[in-house]
Amino acid sequence: MEKEGVKNYLVLVVDIDDDIGRKAGLNTPILGREENIKALIKLGLADPGDSDVNAILGGVKIYDELKASGKDVEIATISGDVDVESEKCALRIKEQIDFLLYLYNPDFIYLVSDGKEDEMILKYLESKNIFVWKKRVIVKQSETLESTYYLIQEFIKKTMEEYIPLILTFIGFSLILYAIFADIGWRIVVGIIGLYILSEGVGVRKLLMEKIKKKEEFDVGRVFPISASISIFILIIGLIYSLSSINKTSSTLTEFIGEFLLHFVDSLTLSLLILMVGKFVDTIINSEKDLLEILKKYFFCLICIFISRELIISGGEYLLKKISFIMFVMCVIIYISIVIILSVILFTKSSKEDKFKKLKNSITKG
């Protein structure tokens, strides 16, 4: 029972990947200062380099400081599961938090962790009308080669995991673009990398992501109508240019259409690209979807545009009798197969992933 005028404090140490259970064989929640010290000693003996040891020490330090200042404070350590994105992990974290809230009824919580992935529970705590302080404990290392290697290893493990899907997706699309379009594929890849580096250099990407996270309004209007107008203008210019460039001596309608397609295809491709870029910018600004999902969708659209270009060129060359019918049919089959395979790979989601996302959303919403 909370005394009148007395505020309850809880120091909550989070080990979301359950190093305490897997390495030290301990069950959570671990309650009280003495039990937490015993736990960190046992975990430290099992793995002296584990960052959760320092997280628990950081929690004990905060506990002692609050106790010394006369606060009514408790300390507890909770853990999740080695598969941090699993339903089991989310349920374990939620159950332990609910138990601690019932047991201690805290007004203030100090959330202590060794990495940002442990802070997935922050929104859940804030939804309970509890003021939360975040404290991230980072291990200090000496400037030796082994320490540098250790820091790099931990950085990759703790930080880069969220970027690996994005990096692998980009590499995969780069290889596909090169395989289909040869030299022009590398130009596209280099252009995308250049745009990304430029956005990083001038701070556009950081500003954009901050505004998206804060759901702030942008000072600019929608880009898609402007890009649509430019695309229509390019199509009209391309149409006029293509008609004026066709050889007047074309003897048959098929030859006329073939030449028209070969002259018009670049204007059509450019207009579609501008249209796609405008839609992409609007989606990034206004959509609440995951960034990786948006990038996959528009990378796929980019490949479809260039595959359509190759098909139109093949059709024009066939009409002009530059390639055989068999070669044209093979091109159509190959490119359509690529589109089907890519769509299956990119947009087929597992039921496990869907369940986890629903569970995670329910936790963050309280």
UniProtKB/Swiss-Prot annotation:
Record bears the keyword Membrane: yes
**Membrane topology reported for the UniProt record:** Multi-pass membrane protein
Q: Name one GO cellular component term.
A: plasma membrane
**Alphabetized Pfam families for the sequence:** DUF373 (PF04123)
What highest taxon heads this organism's lineage?
Archaea
Keyword tags: Cell membrane, Membrane, Transmembrane, Transmembrane helix
What residue ranges are annotated as transmembrane? Answer: 164-184, 188-208, 223-243, 256-276, 299-319, 325-345
InterPro entries xref list: DUF373
Subcellular location per the Swiss-Prot or TrEMBL entry: Cell membrane
Q: List all disulphide bridges recorded for this chain.
A: none
Q: Which PANTHER family match?
A: DUF373 FAMILY PROTEIN, HYPOTHETICAL MEMBRANE PROTEIN, CONSERVED, DUF373 FAMILY
Indicate the family of this protein: To A.fulgidus AF2058.
Name of protein: Uncharacterized protein MJ1032
The scientific name of the source species is: Methanocaldococcus jannaschii (strain ATCC 43067 / DSM 2661 / JAL-1 / JCM 10045 / NBRC 100440) (Methanococcus jannaschii)
